[in-house]
């Protein structure tokens, strides 16, 4: 539960409560005393509270930073009884006894627009998720959608004049889903795109329903209360009633706490009940709040990103997260598009191609953010399960001994992982989904590789194969011997390349002044020794993208011919020159280019082999995953337990019917 979170309740006055302890923080009444306060709503930064009374005397904006102080009065004498703020708290919509819906500009303190489409008293108003539409309900049973951008109103829809609309709420996840409750106890979910019922829950309440509220963290859950003392929880997906509770008094108001686990419910006797959804048998706290009926309950908005906000995108408010707009993407806006109600909530997935980073990426990592703070991609698997466990993972501490995990070794989204000599680890995150279509972009061919003295972070497939239970022991012994040879060759190659670098630099400055005989005898040694050392170095060096290293057996066979031909070319070049002359800059450049081209060709060959290996591994992993799923589905169902569960269900039904 968020620290210092508060909620407001209205009845004969307005009271502000601490949500955790349910203790009174403050109370005030900015309206005419005899009349109840029918509607309250918080600003997005939780500093201001807007109230309206059942008499419609005026709309009052009060500051609640310290003590509640009325700051602004609007619509005096205009009979406005219900209010709602947009996500920026710059515009206020109100409706009331004069059948009019007014949109107020709080900056200029004037009516921005008046909508006179209703034929009877307006009972409730609310903004949609992106503040482009206003939904309003009336005593005549009409629901009208008003477009803020086009200044047009929809054709009235509803169930008829005998079903007065008492409360309207938009779903926080399914953007085109609007819930309504009416006097005859019917609860309806509307598809606002087609303005037709998505589902009717008939006869759920035996008396007028008074309030509806959608869960801020669970896209399937919503709750209604009514004067029949019932609290009913619903599942929007299966369109069924999940649970029904009966209180000890008629219920008049309901709201979810931003954590999604707690309900605050007001009654006609002035009491407020706090329910925990994890143990719904009885309220965990009950307080006597008002002398008259509780008209409205409104929680402050969460000042930290709620799970629903993370699941559905990022909010555009830097200071507070509105429960209504926590799931609006940063580029959100625009009118609603026609179509059916979306069963799955939309996710804010940008189409930015992955950029190469010096990092290793593991499956399930959340996408990194660019400089503007917008996520490049969102792992939908992570998002759908985030309510159960966090999925942000840091993959770090990859050393050059090849101690990486199986997923990192063969992950097709792994990018270049190169560190300098002084670096000990490589840390990063990247996209963890939709990897198969991006193989070409993730593994680009290296056109201009650069040979330097920096040490290269590499992961040997040896560690993966040695840990694999399906391999035979003789293969493990062969690979172990190969790895030892590779390691020794790597150590020798460092010394030989240092000598080779000194030789070239000395020739370039004119310091190679050896005798003819010594030069003739030493030159072949100097350039024949690197033949073996180049071979060892190339075996140990990873491909250009640093994603993996080739099999030592394959690499040794390929390298033998390449290194042999390269050494012969170098020796021939040195032998054709004059024995007592130092190497010219042209010869040195020619040798460097030969080495560079050979290494480049070898890298590309290794790169192709590794890509093919990884694709094959992905296929094998996918086949294994499908096989595991089929086995789990086959053996996870226990017939005895299923029969026992059915028996217990029948017994519960009988007990409920009798008791």
UniProtKB/Swiss-Prot annotation:
The UniProt entry, under SUPFAM superfamilies, shows: WD40 repeat-like
Ranges in coiled-coil conformation = none
Biased composition regions of type Polar residues, renumbered to the chain: 508-522
Q: Could you name the Gene Ontology cellular component terms for this entry?
A: apical part of cell; centriole; centrosome; ciliary basal body; cytoplasm; cytosol; fibrillar center; nucleoplasm
Q: What does this protein do?
A: Required for mitosis progression. Promotes the nucleation of microtubules from the spindle.
WD repeats mapped onto the chain: 1-31, 32-71, 75-114, 117-156, 160-200, 204-244, 246-285, 289-332
UniProt lists compositionally biased (Basic and acidic residues) regions at 413-432
Does the keyword Transmembrane helix belong to this entry? Answer: no
What gene name is given for the protein in this entry? Answer: NEDD1
Protein name per its UniProtKB record: Protein NEDD1
MF annotations from Gene Ontology: gamma-tubulin binding
**UniProt modification remark:** During mitosis, prior phosphorylation on Thr-549 by CDK1 promotes subsequent phosphorylation by PLK1 on Thr-382, Ser-426 and Ser-636. Phosphorylated NEDD1 can interact with gamma-tubulin for targeting the gamma-tubulin ring complex (gTuRC) to the centrosome, an important step for spindle formation.
Keyword Amino-acid biosynthesis present in the record's keywords: the answer is no
* Places the protein is found: Cytoplasm, Cytoskeleton, Microtubule organizing center, Centrosome
Write down the species: Bos taurus (Bovine)
